[in-house]
UniProtKB/Swiss-Prot annotation:
GO terms for biological process: defense response to virus. InterPro entries: CRISPR-assoc_prot_DxTHG_CS (IPR013383), CRISPR-assoc_prot_TM1812 (IPR011742). Keywords: Antiviral defense. Disulfide bonds: none annotated. It comes from the Archaea. Encoded in a type III-A CRISPR locus. This is CRISPR-associated protein MJ1674. CRISPR (clustered regularly interspaced short palindromic repeat) is an adaptive immune system that provides protection against mobile genetic elements (viruses, transposable elements and conjugative plasmids). CRISPR clusters contain spacers, sequences complementary to antecedent mobile elements, and target invading nucleic acids. CRISPR clusters are transcribed and processed into CRISPR RNA (crRNA). The keyword Cell wall biogenesis/degradation does not apply.
Amino acid sequence: MLKVLISPLGVGDTNTDVYKRQYKTAEYKFEGDIDGIESPFVLSVLIEKLKVDKVIVVGTAKSMWEKLYEYYAKEVGEFDEEYWIEIGKKVGMSKYDNYALSEEDLKKIEKVIDKYLKKINPNAVGGSKCKIIKYGIDKDEIWENFDLFMSLINEVNDGDEIYLDITHSFRSIPLFMYVMLEFMRYFKNVKLKGIYYGMLDVIRELGHAPVVDLSPIFEISEWIRGMYEFTTYGNSYLISKLLENEDKEIAEKLQKISRYIDANYLKELREEVKTLKPLLNEKKDTGRFLKYFIPELHKFIDKLKYEDSDFEFQISMAKWNFDNKKYSSGYLCLTDSIFWKLCELYNLPSVYKNREVMKGIIYNPSLNKKYSAFGSIKDMHYKRLRNIRNKIAHADVSKKGDDFNPENDLEDVVNLLKNVNLPDFDKIIEDLLLDVKNNQNNKTLKLLKNILNIQIIRKIIKAYNFESNEIYWDFVSGYLLNKNNKCNNEKLREIIEIFHKNIEDAGELEEAFNFVKNTEDEELLDSLALQNAIMHYALFKLSNAYNIKNKEDKEAIKWVLLNQNLCSKHPILKEINNNYHKIFKNKDKPMSNEILEASKNIIRLLNSDLSEIKDSVPLNLIIIRYRSYKNNRR
């Protein structure tokens, strides 16, 4: 890793007499330094301060190359007056359209600069270069200069530290340097360590020329690029890196959002976006750059309709992806959004099994023939979207994909589902039962059984006064209706058996539908079943929070639910413990509002952020107390 200084050389004194041409000496002072450094060249001041390994000097044929040579040759005791005069003459003879000086003429200057570098820093590697550019008075010369600056990329290596001096020469030079540095950073992985400007204009006022590091300006351009990459492509890797020192919390959140966008993890993305907005409102006037970035973040968030329905959120993600040419993610969102919308229209949470049931309904031959809405939706999915989606998802190289028009496809899906006229869910069940009686089809039987399970879950949710959302759907289907759940209630036991039974007969299915329909809500209430389901649900959630898998540790987690002392060490555990006591002590009594409310509270708490629980109540402490409890019982 080398330190490389790139510095322009100005014209200085325009006198054609080499003996009279002068580069004015000035006292240069760095921020924080008490003493300044006198020199005709800010280049030498930077060399002394930075201890660089090599220098690249850029100037026109009219720049004061002979004075540069004179200064460094005398510093290292190798001044050649004949060479000095020759260079001076060639500089004097050069015109903007006729250069008498070539880079070959400057080789001796390169050598004395390298020796000077060794004098200042014995470890300097050397390899300095002197480069001649055009004036840049027309487009052709501008492109010639651009080519020269781009060739400097070959003078640096991966990992080198770059220092720029922009004090002298044409005002176009810093612009070329900026573009060159951008290329260097991407193709050579170099690091910008400083952009220095010797402020000669304020010498009269201050008595010295401050050497100012302007690299924060380059940092601002990094912020702008990072902001653009995130709001346009969802790529937060640059902006989050820049934000780490300014606001680590937002930096980490943007990293998560970026990962979820890349992976198309819409549930996790939605949750992160939902919590980002209030966080931004808290910090709207903070940070050097964050305060300018926050309004753009709000615009980005507003494009993702995270507060609307699942379908609206998916459609907004499809549109955002299409707008930003991320067609693969866009089509994955758009294709699956159809089944999310159908779940919404039938008042079902958009869990995977429900979406599969919706797919089964629109693909059922008798239903999509009888109801034009289902036929239209099936055609949209099967004929227009499915092949594109599968081609993307499976990276198929064996055949060409279908042509696609994202904007039209998006508009047509939205319009189709906005105005769709669907049959009642009970009517679908009636039609399918009739169809399966006349033609006992295994696919239709399986679809009906899955619909029956939906009706059972709906029935339980209504009976227990739960919300019909994904959280309660998961709790009811996975825990309350678990085939091993303990029950005092015979009706609930029968419902659980039906839920898990593989029914392959149309008549038996019809009986099951009627049984579920005719069962009163009150007949399904069971305090013991609810307590047992809550216990296993809590065990699952807390085991995940503690990342445990072995049986003994899980038993300890189950035990801690009733341990008031340990649970009191964290507010979430304390509240879970208080509510669980209410359920546990009443598990053999008739269902009450107190038990139901306590259960809802626990489910809510278990779906909050549990990441800090293990810090307040470490697993090893739980295990020690649990083992002590077991030993005392023997």
